[in-house]
Amino acid sequence: MVPSTFSRLKAARCLPVVLAALIFAGCGTHTPDQSTAYMQGTAQADSAFYLQQMQQSSDDTRINWQLLAIRALVKEGKTGQAVELFNQLPQELNDSQRREKTLLAAEIKLAQKDFAGAQNLLAKITPADLEQNQQARYWQAKIDASQGRPSIDLLRALIAQEPLLGAKEKQQNIDATWQALSSMTQEQANTLVINADENILQGWLDLQRVWFDNRNDPDMMKAGIADWQKRYPNNPGAKMLPTQLVNVKAFKPASTNKIALLLPLNGQAAVFGRTIQQGFEAAKNIGTQPVAAQVAAAPAADVAEQPQPQTADGVASPAQASVSDLTGDQPAAQPVPVSAPATSTAAVSAPANPSAELKIYDTSSQPLSQILSQVQQDGASIVVGPLLKNNVEELLKSNTPLNVLALNQPENIENRVNICYFALSPEDEARDAARHIRDQGKQAPLVLIPRSALGDRVANAFAQEWQKLGGGTVLQQKFGSTSELRAGVNGGSGIALTGSPITPRATTDSGMTTNNPTLQTTPTDDQFTNNGGRVDAVYIVATPGEIAFIKPMIAMRNGSQSGATLYASSRSAQGTAGPDFRLEMEGLQYSEIPMLAGGNLPLMQQALSAVNNDYSLARMYAMGVDAWSLANHFSQMRQVQGFEINGNTGSLTANPDCVINRKLSWLQYQQGQVVPAS
């Protein structure tokens, strides 16, 4: 028998070994906390991974995985799930988790399009308290909350973010910085006030000044950029130029020695094609000069005795033609011109070139594919046209290598390095109206449109542009025929300033909404509902006969003190307006092309003479003239951001897709006169 003393000694000696084994066994099965690496941004995964880790963890580690899952869900566009998980976060968080929660709340607000809510949350965060990867997200949230509206705060956010980014992201940041700078007007830029130690911002503003001074002269612009890079060698933009300015340095002018003009010369659209051809050939032979965008006030002459337009090819004007794929319903006869032009600020002209070879191709006589093949064989250096929308769609499918100034635009714009789009359409006019009304400080617009496809297109274009400019909900109200309007006047019903919200087709995103009460988007001051008293601007798209009923009906229902300013498209103005009509339209603002607003009286007289005083066709004539200017500056429009031509159809600039934007003249009826809108 073994002595009991020996057994106790042996057991005592074995105990440390057993305990050590148990300890090491426990260490072997324990998984270290990996959430920290993910929180710091040194590792990344998708939401499914984070959710799985969250289910398998507890305490602070579980909260970290939960925060990571929320961040991933927002990034993946699963906003509803992100909100649900966000609202399950516990109240007790450490400082690091609390900062992450606040940042996530702002990012969710941005995903929900609640920009004001996001800005309020971001104001509670001190960037210096954040980790480096959180700082990059914070500045990006500040940038997104600005909605692209240029401001000193946006510039500061972009500059603060730049050092935190990788090479690819740096280029995007620099391009965004330049986009903000080049989107400002010179007046906006002159009001900026910066601190003495903001050297990088000062450098950017000096580059902006170079651009303002030289944007219509590519050679001077190249020299100015090179000089700026020498003066600011440490500026991020000097080390890595904005893409738009790289394009300027690589600028080469396009040739217009051999031009192909693609137009419909037969059928209902022939009257438009031949009128554009007339304007184009006139400009080719005599050249063009800058046109005043704004004019001085003058009494409107009574032109009721003007001869009426004569019918050409069975169609008196674009308004009478059933050509749905051209530019939609065309405006009727247009307003009395006011006084002489003021001095132009964008001194860009297109010289005459009578010797340039011009060949006309009839798009109504053969398929566009055959025409393009022939154009290429003929050696054209640039194509102007086609005019009809369906032909522009065919043009894109052809993948032609030729430089093309299309005289319309497709439903879905495609960015092609060799194509620009120049259209005169009601949608284009509606976008300009949105910009004009927004510039006048209005917040709550109502669009009053005909019950038709035209009305739907105009409403969608206006709402898209309004929201792009940072506005909220736009209301719409539709009206019927002239006989229905007459009945409304006789019945004394009037028109209430109410309507239903427009949801722009291109911006609908059902994945960005949520019914969760904690982080649900709530309407801001400019995201109103159909409260008639809140409407402060009404944009009317109507014929002269329709607006003659509509304006009195608005006054009948709302009184003269409704507080809403009335605006109209050029469709509602008329070249033969007498004093009674002008007095009836008192206070109404309407848009017009500069040529017919008095910005180029000699050309207006020439155009009206050529089209038998049809103001609608005179617009197409002006389009032909401007097409010559654009063809001569095709490379500048395509490559030089901010290049501007003060044309007869508007102040012409191009967006990044080379869609030509037209800033129109705005006029107003005042005591029987037509004057510039204030």
Swiss-Prot record:
Signal peptide: 1-26
N-palmitoyl cysteine: lipidated positions: 27
Family according to the record: Belongs to the LpoA family.
GO molecular function: enzyme regulator activity; hydrolase activity, hydrolyzing O-glycosyl compounds
Job description of the protein: Regulator of peptidoglycan synthesis that is essential for the function of penicillin-binding protein 1A (PBP1a).
Subunit (UniProt): Interacts with PBP1a.
Biological processes per GO annotation: peptidoglycan biosynthetic process; regulation of cell shape
The protein's name in its UniProt record: Penicillin-binding protein activator LpoA
Cysteine pairs bridged by disulfides in the record: none
Organism superkingdom: Bacteria
Main location: membrane
Localisation per UniProt entry: Cell outer membrane
Region called Disordered, residue ranges: 300-340, 496-528
Compositionally skewed regions (Low complexity) per UniProt: 300-310, 330-340, 513-528
InterPro entries found in the cross-reference section: LpoA, Lytic_TGlycosylase_superhlx_U, Peripla_BP_I, TPR-like_helical_dom_sf
Membrane topology: Lipid-anchor
UniProt key word Signal: yes
Keywords carried by this UniProt record: Cell outer membrane, Cell shape, Lipoprotein, Membrane, Palmitate, Peptidoglycan synthesis, Signal
Any Pfam family hit: LppC
GO CC terms of this entry: periplasmic side of cell outer membrane; periplasmic space
